[in-house]
Amino acid sequence: VNLLLDTDVLSEAQRPAPDLKVLGWLDAVDEDRVFISVASIAELRRGIALMDDGRRRAALAAWLADDLPTRFAERILAIDRAVAEHWGDLMAQSRRSGVALSVLDGFFAATALAKNLTLVTRNVKDFAPFGVTLFNPWGE
């Protein structure tokens, strides 16, 4: 099974006091089967840009610029045509059904569906209505 990490999983590992269950899961998983989306890079960059200047912001900016791209290298997934088509269908489904799906969450769901990946997230309720295979490393 190949996996797509939602931004919340990436962020958890960088928290000052991360959830040990999530860290244990990340340590145990075969990293060659773990992918991230460019949407996570956008979401993380936005979050860092909104932080006040300081050591934490600088450390996270360095992690995003250097560590993350090195760690995931060829496993950073772009929004290609297949993802875009799935995204369009998902956003239409969201609107028709009245079940909210944010633009970024739509890209995570579309990437998981287009690439046949299990989406690893804490926010399973946000994705469950859209047919995405999900895993919650928090075990909730």
Regions inferred by a protein language model and the residue ranges of each:
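Short, well-structured N-terminal submotif of metal-dependent ribonuclease cores
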Residues: 1-40, 49-66, 125, 140
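Short, conserved clusters of charged catalytic residues that mark active-site
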Residues: 17-21, 103, 119
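Active-site neighborhoods of divalent-metal-dependent phosphate/nucleic-acid chemistry enzymes
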Residues: 46-54, 70-118
